[in-house]
From Swiss-Prot:
One of its GO terms (molecular function) is magnesium ion binding. One of its GO terms (biological process) is L-leucine biosynthetic process. This is 3-isopropylmalate dehydrogenase. PANTHER family: 3-ISOPROPYLMALATE DEHYDROGENASE (PTHR42979:SF1). It is an enzyme of class 1 (oxidoreductase). Pathway: Amino-acid biosynthesis; L-leucine biosynthesis; L-leucine from 3-methyl-2-oxobutanoate: step 3/4. Substrate binds at residues 97, 107, 136, 225. Catalyzes the oxidation of 3-carboxy-2-hydroxy-4-methylpentanoate (3-isopropylmalate) to 3-carboxy-4-methyl-2-oxopentanoate. The product decarboxylates to 4-methyl-2 oxopentanoate. Keywords: Amino-acid biosynthesis, Branched-chain amino acid biosynthesis, Cytoplasm, Leucine biosynthesis, Magnesium, Manganese, Metal-binding, NAD, Oxidoreductase. It catalyses: (2R,3S)-3-isopropylmalate + NAD(+) = 4-methyl-2-oxopentanoate + CO2 + NADH. Its EC number is 1.1.1.85. The gene is LEU2.
C-alpha cells in the first residue's frame, strides 16, 4: 500500500537552504528504495528570508501549510543583517512553536560515534557513555511571560509563569519517552526550587504526576546550577530523560551540545503530543544556528539529517527507515567522510551524497 507524507520545508536563513537540501536528498533516497513511500515537499519562508520577502518572520501561508502537514523540517533562522529590531527572524520561530502547540523540545546528547570521542572537550573517560535527552518545555515560561521594555526609565523586567497543567503535560511527555525503553529510562527534573516560586510548583507537579500516573518510573530532582556542574564533571550521571523549563532547557541543552564535539552532529524534535504511536506531529531542526559567516559548502548536514531520522521515527511511523538513516550517518562518519568541523575535508553535498547512498544499503 502506497503512502504519501506531506513535509513542509522551511529552509530559513544562510546555511538553512544547504542543510535542508541534504536532508530532503536522504528522504528521496528512501523513496527510491521503497516505492510505496512518497514524500510531498512543500517549501515556504521563515525568518529573515520571510522578512525580506513579506515583511513578517512567519507568513500566514507558511503557518497554514505547516498545520496541515505530517511534519515540518526547519533549517535555521537569524543573522546580523536583521539585528535586534522590532521585527526579528526569531519571532517566526517562537510563533510557529506556539501556533502548532509544540510544547516539548527533545535534544539528544549521546556518543553514537566512538570514532569522534577525541572531538569532545571532555576527556574520553568522562564523555564515553553519555546518553541523555533534554526534554525542554517550549511554549511557556519566561520566554512567553509578561515583560516590560525600557521606556526611558531605566527599568525592565521579564516574568516566568507556569501552571499545573503545563508542567503535567511536559512530565507526561518525558514519562512516555521513558516507557519506550526496557527497562524504562530514569528521569531527571531540573529546577531552581530553592529560589523561584515557579520552580517550586514545577518540582511539586513533576513529583506528583510521576507518583500518581507512572508509579513504575522514578524521578530525581536537581537544581539547575548543580546540574550544569554535573554535566561537565560526570555527564553520564544524567543519562536518561532530563526534563526542565523553557529557559533552563535552552541553556542546559546548549551546554550539553558541546560534549559530542560539534553542534553539527546534534538533532532536535519539537512535538505537539507524546509519540506513543510514532505519529506525533512535530517540527524537526538541527541544534545549530544559521552560521552567516560560514562559506558555502562548509556546513555539516549531519544534525539536520539526524533530525530527519527523528522525524521518521516519531512522526511518520517509519521506525525502520529512521534507524537506517542513523546507521548510514554512522557508517559515513566512521569512514572518514566529514566536514571541517569534524576535522574533515568533505563538502556539505559530499557528506549528504554519501549518507543518501548509504541509506539505500540499510533498507
Amino acid at each position: 500500500m502506497s503512502t504519501t507524507k506531506t513535509i513542509v520545508v522551511l529552509p530559513g536563513d544562510h546555511v538553512g537552504t544547504e542543510i535542508t537540501e541534504e536532508a530532503t536528498k536522504v528522504l528521496n533516497a528512501i523513496a527510491e528504495k521503497r516505492p510505496n513511500i512518497k514524500f510531498d515537499f512543500q517549501h515556504h519562508l521563515i525568518g529573515g528570508a520571510a522578512i525580506d520577502a513579506t515583511g513578517v518572520p512567519l507568513p500566514d501561508e507558511a503557518l497554514e501549510a505547516s498545520k496541515k502537514a505530517d511534519a515540518v523540517l526547519l533549517g535555521a533562522v537569524g543573522g546580523p543583517k536583521w539585528g535586534t529590531g522590532d521585527v526579528r527572524p526569531e519571532q517566526g520561530l517562537l510563533k510557529i512553536r506556539k501556533e502548532l502547540g509544540l510544547y516539548a523540545n527533545l535534544r539528544p546528547c549521546n556518543f553514537a560515534f566512538d570514532s569522534l570521542l577525541d572531538m569532545s572537550p571532555l576527556k574520553p573517560e568522562y564523555a564515553r557513555g553519555t546518553d541523555f535527552t533534554v526534554v525542554r518545555e517550549l511554549v511557556c515560561g519566561i520566554y512567553f511571560g509578561k515583560r516590560k521594555e525600557d521606556t526611558g526609565d531605566g527599568v525592565t523586567w521579564d516574568s516566568e509563569q507556569y501552571s499545573v497543567p503545563e508542567v503535567q503535560r511536559i512530565t507526561r511527555m518525558a514519562a512516555s519517552l521513558a516507557l519506550q525503553h526496557n527497562p524504562p529510562l530514569p528521569i531527571w527534573s531540573l529546577d531552581k526550587a530553592n529560589v523561584l516560586a515557579s520552580s517550586r510548583l514545577w518540582r511539586k507537579t513533576v513529583e506528583e504526576t510521576i507518583k500518581n500516573e507512572f508509579p513504575t518510573l522514578s524521578v530525581q530532582h536537581q537544581l539547575i546550577d548543580s546540574a550544569a556542574m554535573i554535566l561537565v564533571k560526570n555527564p553520564t550521571k544524567l543519562n536518561g530523560l532530563v526534563i526542565t523549563s523553557n529557559m533552563f532547557g535552552d541553556i542546559i541543552s546548549d551546554e550539553a551540545s558541546v560534549i559530542p564535539g560539534s553542534l553539527g552532529l546534534l538533532p532536535s524534535a519539537s512535538l505537539a503530543s507524546p509519540p506513543d504511536t510514532n505519529k506525533a506531529f512535530g517540527l524537526y531542526e538541527p541544534c545549530h544556528g544559521s552560521a552567516p559567516d560560514l562559506p558555502k559548502g562548509k556546513v555539516n548536514p549531519v544534525a539536520t539529517i539526524l533530525s530527519v531520522a527523528m522525524m521518521l521515527k516519531l512522526s511518520l511511523d517509519m521506525v525502520e527507515e529512521g534507524i537506517a538513516v542513523e546507521k548510514a550517518v554512522r557508517k559515513v562518519i566512521d569512514n572518514g567522510i566529514r566536514t571541517a568541523d569534524l576535522r574533515g575535508t568533505n563538502s556539505t553535498t559530499e557528506v549528504g551524497d554519501a549518507i543518501a547512498a548509504a541509506v539505500k544499503e540499510f533498507l
